[in-house]
């Protein structure tokens, strides 16, 4: 089976929905950020502190290339994975891409107390999320086969909508 690749902003529910999708479809689930942390033996904030965002993005690109080369997985990506052209090409070629859209207001609510998000550990995280969304939303849409709204929706309903929408797509 082709991979299902979840893209979207932080706080959209990629990991939660990805696990549920994988269970429903009897597929393996991989979270690219968690895979990077396991390989490095360090968390994302530490990698950002030591290697900077560029160093982290290099690791991310290598991980996405590896994960997308396999088949039959649900893959949750980091929110910034779409920023590199090479990543977008890998993701697009690596399977069906589902953009989990969340409004900035919901992103703020879902990430407010999460200290594991280096890009938000600055003054005015709400403005940071607005700026990131303005930059990334067109890139998520560029590679998405399906766009699904996650605001005010239980994860199981989002999973059902994803499955219904994917069934309606022509085969690749």
Swiss-Prot record:
| Pathways per UniProt | Metabolic intermediate biosynthesis; chorismate biosynthesis; chorismate from D-erythrose 4-phosphate and phosphoenolpyruvate: step 5/7
- What family is reported? Belongs to the shikimate kinase family.
Q: What does this protein do?
A: Catalyzes the specific phosphorylation of the 3-hydroxyl group of shikimic acid using ATP as a cosubstrate.
Q: One short Pfam family name for this protein? A: SKI
Query: Where is it predominantly found?
Result: cytoplasm
Question: Any one cellular component term from GO for this entry?
Answer: cytosol
Note describing how the cofactor binds: Binds 1 Mg(2+) ion per subunit.
Give the main EC class: transferase
**Gene3D superfamilies, per this entry?**
P-loop containing nucleotide triphosphate hydrolases
Q: In the record, what terms sit under GO molecular function?
A: ATP binding; magnesium ion binding; shikimate kinase activity
Q: Which residues bind Mg(2+)?
A: 15
Subunit organization = Monomer.
Tagged with keyword Metal-binding: yes
What the entry lists under PANTHER family is as follows: SHIKIMATE KINASE, SHIKIMATE KINASE 1, CHLOROPLASTIC
User: What's the Enzyme Commission number for this chain?
Assistant: 2.7.1.71
Name of the protein: Shikimate kinase
Annotated positions binding substrate: 33, 57, 79, 136
Q: Where do the annotations place ATP binding?
A: 11-16, 117, 153
Presence of the UniProt keyword Cytoplasm in the record: yes
């Amino acid at each position: 089976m082709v991979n299902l690749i979840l893209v979207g902003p932080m706080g959209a529910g990629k990991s939660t929905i990805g696990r549920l999708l994988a269970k429903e479809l009897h597929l393996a689930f991989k979270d690219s950020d968690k895979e990077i942390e396991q390989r490095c033996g360090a968390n994302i904030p530490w990698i950002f502190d030591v290697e900077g965002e560029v160093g982290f993005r290099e690791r991310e690109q290598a991980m996405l290339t590896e994960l997308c080369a396999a088949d039959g997985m649900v893959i949750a990506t980091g929110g910034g994975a779409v920023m590199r052209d090479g990543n977008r090409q890998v993701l697009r070629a690596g399977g069906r891409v589902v953009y989990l859209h969340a409004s900035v207001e919901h992103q703020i609510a879902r990430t407010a107390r999460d200290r594991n998000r280096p890009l938000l550990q600055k003054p005015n995280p709400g403005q940071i999320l607005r700026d990131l969304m303005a930059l990334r939303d067109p890139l998520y849409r560029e590679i998405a086969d399906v766009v699904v709204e996650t605001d005010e929706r239980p994860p199981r309903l989002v999973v059902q909508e994803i499955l219904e929408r994917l069934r309606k797509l022509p085969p690749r």
